[in-house]
């Protein structure tokens, strides 16, 4: 029988070989095996945990194996062992012996090496190893090892925090990125909220429509109007719904996989219409399946930056981005994303903004959002857009969010909104609201 550690190793190898998302691969992999709920939890903790702490574990492995080249599979297996030793309540003998047995299955000659590395790591102790690895290092290198983030991401987060008046929060943010997030549900309708409350679910702290999931989220998705959605994403759609003309036609410009579209659909259901663009066929199908009444909403397989077929009273541009705001849920992103990808992303974001401005009716609202706090994708992008489009103005979004969620600690000196996992318990969503002049 395949055990939990072997499944976790296979998952890690697949994620790294194909640059896939662990949250997509994990359910499919678990469905192939008949294992207990406890082992399912073990697979999840091992795979997510190692992906989060990969850089730190690699630094420890390299320190304990100077001059040696390890195969990817062997390195992954030792990472699993280190995670059990240092961050799980697994007995030392079990963490080491199970790892050695795992290595014997695919690289017998390396069993002794894996045993030696783990025993030396256990003898040295986690804190002592970190002290050795960070001694004499600059702050950026120290933070990179301590919190297992690439240096370029730490620098980007630092700049974003400084702009938001939170320059002292860097360590707290990096730590939050390594925490396991609570699964959040959204009750799109009041009837759905009543059902979730009757089941004993607690309200979320950030979104007025949010609930904290208990157990398997699939158990709640049969309730009409209930979706799995981070509270930050909920607030994007709810804020747009609050400020836009509900009698008009709205556009969700980059709508896949459909979570925000479902919220917008409900907002315009009485007197307006919703159109959804999504360039990828599979994701467009996900949008359709997320809608309550797909026949009343046009889901078009279309690129947002292409010439619009009509004009809209309100547009949501949830732009493609580096995705660094969701590192809690997608830990592998810190290793698959690179700074070299940013120029093409920011170019696409600018093209999408320009297309959205063209497609807006006079007086129309454009909600720009990213699941990334990087300044180049957020405030810098908005400043550049306002420079290009004299007929657009920035609307103060802070009062809108404060009315939706009075408990949020927002920076009231700026008109845009940046959410943070360590402060708000959400993904690091950015939002900006722009309005087109009435005469243009």
For every predicted segment, state its role.
Residues 1-440:
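S-adenosylmethionine
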């Amino acid at each position: 029988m395949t055990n939990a550690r072997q499944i976790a190793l296979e998952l890690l190898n697949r994620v790294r070989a194909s640059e896939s998302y662990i949250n997509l691969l994990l359910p499919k992999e678990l469905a192939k095996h008949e294992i207990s709920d406890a082992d399912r939890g073990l697979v999840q903790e091992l795979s997510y945990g190692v992906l989060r702490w990969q850089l730190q574990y690699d630094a420890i492995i390299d320190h304990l194996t100077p001059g040696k080249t390890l195969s990817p599979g062997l390195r992954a297996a030792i990472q699993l062992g280190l995670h059990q030793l240092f961050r799980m309540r697994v007995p030392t003998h079990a963490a080491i012996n199970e790892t050695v047995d795992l290595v014997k299955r695919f690289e017998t000659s390396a069993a002794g090496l894996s045993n030696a590395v783990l025993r030396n790591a256990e003898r040295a102790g986690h804190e002592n190893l970190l002290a050795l690895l960070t001694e004499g290092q600059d702050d950026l290198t120290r933070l990179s090892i301590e919190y297992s983030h690439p240096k370029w991401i730490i620098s980007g987060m630092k700049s974003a925090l400084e702009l938001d008046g939170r320059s002292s929060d860097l360590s707290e943010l990096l730590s939050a990125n390594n925490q396991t997030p609570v699964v959040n549900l959204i009750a799109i309708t009041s009837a759905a909220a009543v059902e979730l409350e009757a089941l004993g679910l607690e309200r979320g702290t950030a979104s007025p429509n949010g609930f904290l999931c208990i157990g398997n989220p699939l158990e709640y998705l049969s309730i009409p109007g209930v979706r799995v959605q981070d509270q930050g994403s909920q607030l994007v759609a709810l804020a747009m719904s609050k400020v836009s003309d509900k009698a008009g036609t709205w556009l969700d410009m980059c709508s896949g996989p459909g979570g925000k579209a479902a919220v917008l659909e409900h907002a315009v259901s009485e007197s307006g219409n919703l159109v959804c663009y999504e360039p990828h066929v599979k994701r467009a199908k996900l949008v359709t399946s997320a809608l309550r009444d797909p026949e009343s909403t046009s889901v078009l397989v279309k690129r947002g930056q292409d010439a619009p077929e009509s004009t809209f009273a309100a547009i949501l541009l949830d732009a493609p981005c580096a995705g660094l705001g969701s590192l809690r849920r997608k830990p592998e992103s810190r290793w698959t994303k690179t700074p070299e990808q940013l120029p093409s992303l920011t170019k696409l974001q600018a093209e999408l903004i320009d297309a959205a401005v063209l497609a807006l009716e006079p007086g129309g609202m454009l909600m720009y959002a990213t699941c990334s706090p990087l300044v180049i994708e957020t405030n810098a992008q908005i400043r550049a857009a306002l420079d290009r489009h004299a007929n657009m103005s920035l609307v103060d979004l802070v009062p809108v969010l404060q009315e939706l969620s009075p408990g949020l600690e927002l920076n009231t000196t700026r008109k845009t909104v940046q959410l943070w996992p360590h402060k708000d318990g959400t993904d690091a969503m950015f939002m900006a609201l722009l309005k087109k002049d009435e005469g243009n």
